[in-house]
């Protein structure tokens, strides 16, 4: 080989390496450049949310989610899909529920609270038996006797009003308590036609959108030639604020769920022990502006918008919990008091945020039209909560139902300001009530958003280090 050829080959190698570095640097800079600045339809900037979440909210909300009151969620994962015959499953075999056998469930939960506090938590053998069920998409229903017995008492603190969600009947034999800490939201392998059908139904039929308008990157939509989605956003910008907000909430929820899957991805499995962690390739596939034709940054901005909406709801509902009559009751007086103190501390932080979304800008037209639009808004969202029963993966269904109910509870709060202001200090109110399930869903859903924003910061660092 001649010297000239060798020099040419070496030069090409250097050029390729330089091009790779430039590409990675460009990717990082584009992601950061496009997911920044002031959000549409509000006066808040992304950097302020990042700092507020990192230093004030995330550490406290994570701690709150570990408390008994907030870690147990009752859900019916056996409700049939009301819209189509669902036959989709996770691509991983363990993406279904494997609850503990009936014989392993402590008798206290079935016999009421007659033997309350008399038994210790599940012994080691029971825990080992149930841990076999906690794999990938499987739901682990392991609970302590004391926790299960306390749930019956919690029920008497609950009441309800009109909802933005289709709530599960907690009295149904199919409803079961799930320990959320034993069932973290993460990648299960659930994907393909079944998953796309769920999101397609949500976007195409429940976002105030005519069938002639298609959202970008929809694999179930007909080919649109050179249309890169601009026609969709032209249509979206022409909508009233309320309908734009609705779409952004759904898109933000979708983005948050996708971030959780990217951040807790099955990296490898050795001798039956899975290893979970962030997957940069999956993150780029879902959010890189080049790979998503500009959609990724829009989705992430909608995540921040959703965070603002739920943050605002927490600040507005604080007076409900500040009353002495409201207890976060589990039966452990000392822990209950500590949990309420922590929750009130979080509420104080939410009220201190200076750039809240102004919900009064919504449904502010003539009373008749505003009332009709608000009801349409509520029914559309309620229908979306029903679609969550069509998710083929039980773990995905669990977290989908919880986060949908959490957002529905946030909307209920934002549109009940007058009722909250009139709450009596020392007696229950018929004007506004939250069930325990709504409270658990609200705080855990916001915790998921807080985690998503934290995960996004981590991915930015990983992209920077990969240059």
UniProtKB/Swiss-Prot annotation:
Compartments it resides in: Endoplasmic reticulum membrane
GO annotation, cellular component aspect: endoplasmic reticulum; endoplasmic reticulum lumen; endoplasmic reticulum membrane
SUPFAM superfamilies: ERO1-like (SSF110019)
InterPro entries: Ero1 (IPR007266), ERO1-like_sf (IPR037192)
Protein's GO biological process: cell redox homeostasis; endoplasmic reticulum to Golgi vesicle-mediated transport; extracellular matrix organization; glucose homeostasis; insulin processing; protein folding; protein folding in endoplasmic reticulum
Tissue expression as described in the entry: Highly expressed in the digestive tract, including the duodenum and lower digestive tract. In the stomach, highly expressed in enzyme-producing chief cells (at protein level). In the pancreas, expressed in islets of Langerhans and, at lower levels, in enzyme-secreting cells (at protein level). Detected at low level in many other tissues.
Modifications after synthesis and translation: N-glycosylated. The Cys-90/Cys-95 and Cys-393/Cys-396 disulfide bonds constitute the redox-active center. The Cys-90/Cys-95 disulfide bond accepts electron from P4HB and funnel them to the active site disulfide Cys-393/Cys-396. The Cys-81/Cys-390 disulfide bond may be critical for structural stability. Two long-range disulfide bonds participate in loose feedback regulation. The Cys-90/Cys-130 disulfide bond may be the predominant regulatory switch to modulate the catalytic activity, while the Cys-100/Cys-262 disulfide bond may play an auxiliary regulatory role.
Signal peptide positions on this chain: 1-33
Disulfide bond positions: 81-390, 90-95, 90-130, 100-262, 207-240, 393-396
Membrane topology of the entry: Peripheral membrane protein
Binding site for FAD: 186, 188, 199, 251, 254, 286, 299
Keyword annotations of the record: Disulfide bond, Electron transport, Endoplasmic reticulum, FAD, Flavoprotein, Glycoprotein, Membrane, Oxidoreductase, Redox-active center, Signal, Transport
Cofactor(s) demanded: FAD
Positions annotated as glycosylated: 122, 140, 145, 383
Highest taxon above the source species: Eukaryota
Induction, as annotated: Up-regulated by inducers of the unfolded protein response (UPR).
A molecular function GO annotation: FAD binding
Activation and inhibition: Glutathione may be required to regulate its activity in the endoplasmic reticulum.
EC number of the protein: 1.8.4.-
Consequence when changing residue 130 to A: Small increase in activity. Significant increased activity
Subunit structure comment from the entry: Homodimer; disulfide-linked. Heterodimer with ERO1A; disulfide-linked. Also detected as monomer. Homodimers may be somewhat less active than monomers. Interacts with P4HB. Interacts with ERP44.
Role this protein plays: Oxidoreductase involved in disulfide bond formation in the endoplasmic reticulum. Efficiently reoxidizes P4HB/PDI, the enzyme catalyzing protein disulfide formation, in order to allow P4HB to sustain additional rounds of disulfide formation. Other protein disulfide isomerase family members can also be reoxidized, but at lower rates compared to P4HB, including PDIA2 (50% of P4HB reoxidation rate), as well as PDIA3, PDIA4, PDIA6 and NXNDC12 (<10%).
Family designation: Belongs to the EROs family.
Name of this protein: ERO1-like protein beta
Organism: Homo sapiens
Designated gene of the protein: ERO1B
């Amino acid at each position: 080989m001649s010297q000239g050829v060798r020099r040419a080959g070496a030069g090409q190698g250097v050029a390729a390496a330089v091009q790779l570095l430039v590409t990675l640097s460009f990717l990082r800079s584009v992601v950061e450049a496009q997911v920044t600045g002031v959000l549409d339809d509000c006066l808040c900037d992304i950097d302020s949310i990042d700092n507020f979440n990192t230093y004030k909210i995330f550490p406290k909300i994570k701690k709150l989610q570990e408390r008994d009151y907030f870690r147990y969620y009752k859900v019916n994962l056996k409700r049939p899909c009301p819209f189509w015959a669902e036959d989709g499953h996770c691509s991983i075999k363990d993406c279904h529920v494997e609850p503990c056998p009936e014989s392993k469930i402590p008798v206290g939960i079935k016999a009421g609270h007659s033997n309350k506090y008399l038994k210790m938590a599940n012994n080691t053998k029971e825990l080992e038996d149930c841990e076999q069920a906690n794999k990938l998409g499987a739901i682990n229903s392991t609970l302590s006797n004391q926790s299960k017995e306390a749930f019956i008492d919690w029920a008497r603190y609950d009441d309800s009003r009109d909802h933005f969600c289709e709530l599960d009947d907690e009295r149904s034999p199919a409803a079961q308590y799930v320990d959320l800490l034993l069932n973290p939201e993460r990648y299960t392998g659930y994907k393909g036609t079944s998953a796309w059908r769920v999101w397609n139904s949500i976007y195409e039929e429940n976002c105030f959108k005519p069938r002639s308008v298609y959202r970008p990157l929809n694999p179930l939509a007909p080919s649109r030639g050179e249309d890169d989605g601009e026609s969709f956003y032209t249509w979206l910008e022409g909508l009233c604020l309320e309908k734009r907000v609705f779409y952004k909430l759904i898109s933000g929820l979708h983005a948050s769920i996708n971030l959780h899957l990217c951040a807790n991805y099955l990296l490898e499995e050795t001798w039956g022990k899975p290893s979970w962690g962030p997957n940069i390739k999956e993150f780029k596939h879902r959010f890189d502006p080049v790979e998503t034709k500009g959609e990724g940054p829009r989705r992430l901005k909608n995540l921040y918008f959703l965070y603002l909406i739920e943050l605002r709801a927490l600040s507005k509902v604080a007076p409900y919990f500040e009353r002495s009559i409201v207890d976060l009751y589990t039966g452990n007086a000392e822990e209950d008091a500590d949990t309420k103190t922590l929750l009130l501390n979080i509420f104080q932080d939410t009220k201190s945020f200076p750039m809240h979304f102004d919900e009064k800008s919504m449904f502010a037209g003539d009373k008749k039209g505003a009332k009709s639009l608000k009801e349409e808004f509520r029914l559309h969202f309620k229908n979306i909560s029903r679609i969550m029963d069509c998710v083929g993966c039980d773990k995905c269904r669990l977290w989908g139902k919880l986060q949908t109910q959490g957002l529905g509870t946030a909307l209920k709060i934002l549109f009940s300001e007058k009722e909250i202001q009139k709450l009596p200090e020392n007696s229950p109110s018929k004007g506004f009530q939250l069930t325990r399930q709504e409270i658990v869903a609200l705080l855990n859903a916001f915790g998921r958003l807080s985690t998503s924003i934290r995960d996004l910061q981590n991915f930015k660092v990983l992209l920077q280090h990969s240059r």
